[in-house]
Regions:
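Noncatalytic alpha-helical scaffold of FAD-dependent oxidoreductases
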Residues: 1-473
Length: 473
């Protein structure tokens, strides 16, 4: 089967990511509505000598999705295909956005155990780049995956799980799109739950002193810090019992619609966006505006469905870099940023975000084998960020920081290899699954290199990734 004329088009259409930090001009665009057409598009690309990248929603800051070959737009490949409310196992098509998934799960009385703070990403894109939320006892989104189906470079479809092709599963849960096109994901979900959200400012020094205690005492803990300010906004989100009567929840209610609109849309987006535009027009004002934003932080407490607390609207555009560091190294990183940021030539408008995660066993996970703190730095769109991001990388390099795969960083193969104990095993599995780098691009070449095809030729079991592959349809 060839990709149908209804789902394929040619022409100089430009792809851009949300932040405006990456763009590309694919030779072909394809919107396959079925697994069979995804497979056909991959085969057609191979016949034409073109590379293939599956597009998400463009919320990676890197050029992870960029291609000059075939762009696979999976926006017609969406929805839940199977759900067992007893076990919580839910199978989802890969082009489904987290926003749509959360709504569908809610209708089934289910939820994701943990989420990041935006929901615009596709499920496959969020998994492939290592998207995470926060919680000292919880892992990133990929730790909620029970099984995957992928279309490999030859167009065959394979399934993998912890018991079936476990190496492919260990690699593909956070695979950067380098192993194949994820078509379905089976998630282990939990019963729907409510969160009690408590947000309040605290002096930065107190937050750092109490960091471990705060992380241990709360289901989901994070804080934001404006680099020139003295206060951080500490966010504690805790799960409620089904009755919703735990602790302070008796006095908390969901935010009324008008207040939610005022605080999230008007104040945190329109108002902050206006301050950012003022800072961009007159950079010398940025430290003052930053301190004003820090001083204006206020407290609020409310309850809502988990995904409505985890996720907040993001209308103000920015560039971002994020690194995972050992939990015990967080204080050093923040202290160095507090010391160095005021001396930067280009002032910083946006806050720093800090989150936590449990260790996991996913090969390219930034939390592989260690409890982690995530430090994310941002700069408003249109303001210079290179000096700030370079400074940040020099600080986190001192503590073996690992970069988020979907956020801006400068690391390459030689600098990444020592950070990931299973890095070379991932590259071996990639060489088996995609020996010609059909799913490659310039970003993957930088962070993974070219597949080592000689290993594939010399391997004792060269077909173990592809064995028992099935035809799509």
């Amino acid at each position: 089967m060839k990709a149908s004329s209804d789902s394929a088009s040619s022409g100089p259409r430009v792809w851009r990511n949300w932040a405006g930090t990456a763009k590309a001009t694919p030779a072909r665009w394809c919107r396959p509505p079925s697994e069979a057409e995804i497979s056909a598009a991959v085969k057609d690309a191979a016949s034409a000598g073109l590379r293939v990248r599956a597009l998400g929603s463009g919320h990676s800051f890197t050029a992870a999705a960029a291609t000059s070959g075939v762009a696979l737009d999976l926006s017609q490949w969406t929805g839940i295909t199977a759900a067992d409310t007893r076990t919580g196992l839910v199978t989802v098509r890969s082009g489904t956005t987290l926003r749509a998934l959360n709504a569908e799960l809610g209708g089934l009385g289910l939820a994701m155990a943990n989420l990041g703070d935006i929901d615009a990403q596709t499920l496959a894109g969020a998994l492939s780049t290592g998207t995470h939320g926060t919680g000292a006892r919880l892992g990133g989104l990929a730790t909620q995956v029970e099984a995957l189906e992928l279309v490999l470079a030859d167009g065959s479809v394979v399934s993998c799980s912890a018991t079936s092709r476990p190496e492919l599963f260990a690699a593909a849960r956070i695979g950067l799109g380098a192993l194949g096109v994820i078509t379905t994901v089976t998630l282990r979900c939990v019963p729907s739950f409510m969160l009690l959200a408590d947000e309040r400012p605290m002096p930065v020094e107190e937050v750092l002193e109490q960091f471990d205690a705060l992380a241990a005492a709360n289901d989901h803990f994070e804080f934001y810090w404006f680099p020139y300010g003295r206060k951080a906004l500490v966010k504690r989100n805790n799960r409620l019992s089904p009755s919703g009567s735990a602790g302070a929840a008796g006095a908390a209610r969901a935010l009324p619609g008008w207040r939610r609109f005022w605080e999230f849309e008007v104040m945190e987006n329109a108002g902050f966006g206006a301050l950012c535009r003022l800072g961009r027009a007159s950079p010398r004002l940025i430290p003052t505006l930053n301190r004003f934003s820090s001083a204006a932080l206020s407290a609020r407490t409310y309850t809502d469905a988990s995904y409505r607390v985890f996720v907040t609207p993001r209308r103000v555009r920015f560039a971002e870099s994020e690194y995972a560091v050992p939990r015990e190294s967080l204080g050093h990183v923040i202290t160095e940023l507090r010391r160095a940021v005021p001396r930067l030539a280009d002032p910083v408008m946006f806050p720093v975000e800090v989150r936590v995660a449990a260790a996991d066993d996913i090969w390219l996970s930034t939390a592989y084998g260690r409890e982690s703190a995530y430090v994310a730095i941002h700069q408003y769109a249109g303001l210079p960020y290179r000096g700030y991001f370079d400074l940040f990388e020099s600080v986190v390099a001192e503590v073996a920081g690992r970069p988020h795969w979907g956020k801006l960083h400068s690391l390459d193969v030689e600098r990444l290899r020592p950070l990931y104990p299973r890095y070379d095993e991932f590259r071996r599995v990639r060489a088996e699954a995609d020996p010609e780098a059909r799913f490659g691009n310039s970003y993957l070449t930088r962070v993974l290199g070219q597949p080592v095809t000689e290993r594939l030729r010399n391997a004792r079991s060269p077909n173990r990734v592809r064995s028992a592959a099935r035809s799509p349809g």
